[in-house]
Amino acid sequence: LTAANNLPVDTPPFPLNTTFKYNSMPHDKMQEYVNVDYNREMSVVALTGEPDQEVIIAEARYVKDDKSAYGELAFVVDEKYHGLGIATYLYEMLIRLAKERGLKGFTAEVLQANTGMMRVFEKGRLPINAHVRNGLSQLTIPFEEKPVKATDENI
């Protein structure tokens, strides 16, 4: 796996702009992923392989900010499975699960060069508010669009 803060459809919570390969994860870090408080965070995975021999090839998660009721997104997809729509599918699942749990939307930080991750969000058909600074796009993705008043300009 390649891990980097929201790089090509990936990211656990590691320092921004850090890219590295890993074959295993320390036990204490793994505990954050296997002991999930589903009231605050949600994690979904994609598997491949035969029953009882499945391998995790992708993970997507959000962690809820209690003050804003928005969830911060993170994705990890094994390099061999990039470009197959897995992150898009997991993103759609997280949208549904977050709405069911009363979240108002998502936030994410994506490097501008990470066009693959931006395509995932664009396919989600939700409005995306982006603020770009120093090559980093800070995204806010509300679940409900604000109503637009009919004016001569938008009719």
Where in the sequence are the language-model features?
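Long, contiguous binding/interaction regions
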Residues: 1-155
